[in-house]
Amino acid sequence: MADIYRFPKFSYEDNGTVEPLPLRTGPDKKAIPHIRIIKVGVPPKHGVRYLDLLLLGFFETPKQTTNLGSVSDLTEPTSYSICGSGSLPIGVAKYYGTDQELLKACTDLRITVRRTVRAGEMIVYMVGSIGAPLLPWSGRLRQGMIFNANKVALAPQCLPVDKDIRLRVVFVNGTSLGAITIAKIPKTLADLALPNSISVNLLVTLKTGISTEQKGVLPVLDDQGEKKLNFMVHLGLIRRKVGKIYSVEYCKSKIERMRLIFSLGLTGGISFHVQVTGTLSKTFMSQLAWKRAVCFPLMDVNPHMNMVIWAASVEITGVDAVFQPAIPRDFRYYPNVVAKNIGRIRKL
């Protein structure tokens, strides 16, 4: 069993909403490009901005033509057919220009895509035609980028391996960063196990503007019968001295003194941001890597949910602190289905 503390509404109501990406088509029946920028924290009103960008679009392959070798092959533009949708995260950089200049530069990119595999399925991106507005990101764009296929492609199995594939950018998601920065809790700290401790996890409840059942994300009915989605993230451990007794009130008081503020961003699709505005113990602060603002991209927490809702309207409707006994150190984590040294099964 776990004890729950519900955060007050004011802790997430200011920046807890993301507007949807409008999907409109032009005379050629192609989607009209659109840029969506959301502010996290208090960015400067004028001048320089720090932007985290995610490019969204369609994977396309050239259509096969019947009149091979004709003169029209040299004069007519190549037509493409859509074989999937996906994204390309390009990171954070300092940007001085306008949103429309950035959108134009992103849609002009030539992005070639290849589906491959290492320990798991991967998507390889190679980028060309980098315009001036994207020069702050050029250090990353000029190098080949590899991502987990299940995080950046909605249906990687639909991407052919024997054809040329391109990513046509249609939408640009941007997170404008102010006092809040993008810092993730390192995996070694998130997986930390301390004896005599209580794990503080956050249960985040979302309301979206689309139906997600047909795409494999089942909602949960709340007390009012409304369909909601939720996910959990780990914040840290509360540890007491040997002999001290844990109580729900003690854990609640520790959380209340932190004065946490929650917001939604667009890092990797949809991201959940936590800012500490109150006091923290040194033990808890060290578990946050000495950061007072941390980011939880849904791309890392729940990739499939992220891909289903990253273009929809999303709103935080509740955040709960869940106090659970920390997992004992002697419990073993099995990241693979094939376990070592069991019968005739052996790992190389």
UniProtKB/Swiss-Prot annotation:
The modification Phosphoserine is found at residue 70. Keywords: Host cell membrane, Host cytoplasm, Host membrane, Host-virus interaction, Membrane, Phosphoprotein, Viral budding, Viral budding via the host ESCRT complexes, Viral matrix protein, Viral release from host cell, Virion. GO terms for molecular function: structural constituent of virion. Pfam families: Matrix_Paramyxo_C, Matrix_Paramyxo_N. GO terms for cellular component: host cell cytoplasm; host cell plasma membrane; membrane; virion component. A motif (YLDL motif) lies at residues 50-53. It is a peripheral membrane protein. It is found in: Virion; Host cytoplasm; Host cell membrane. The keyword Membrane applies. GO terms for biological process: viral budding via host ESCRT complex. InterPro entries: Matrix_C, Matrix_N, Matrix_Paramyxo_C, Matrix_Paramyxo_N. A large portion is phosphorylated in the cytoplasm, but not in virion. However, this phosphorylation is not essential for virus replication. It comes from the Viruses. Late-budding domains (L domains) are short sequence motifs essential for viral particle budding. They recruit proteins of the host ESCRT machinery (Endosomal Sorting Complex Required for Transport) or ESCRT-associated proteins. The matrix protein contains one L domain: a YLDL motif. Homomultimer. Binds to the cytoplasmic regions of F and HN proteins. Interacts with nucleocapsid. Interacts with human alpha-tubulin and beta-tubulin. Interacts with host ANP32B. Plays a crucial role in virion assembly and budding. Forms a shell at the inner face of the plasma membrane and concentrates the HN and F glycoproteins. Acts as a negative regulator for transcription and replication by sticking to the nucleocapsid. This effect might be regulated by the cytoplasmic interaction with tubulin that dissociates the M protein from the nucleocapsid. Belongs to the morbillivirus/respirovirus/rubulavirus M protein family. This is Matrix protein.
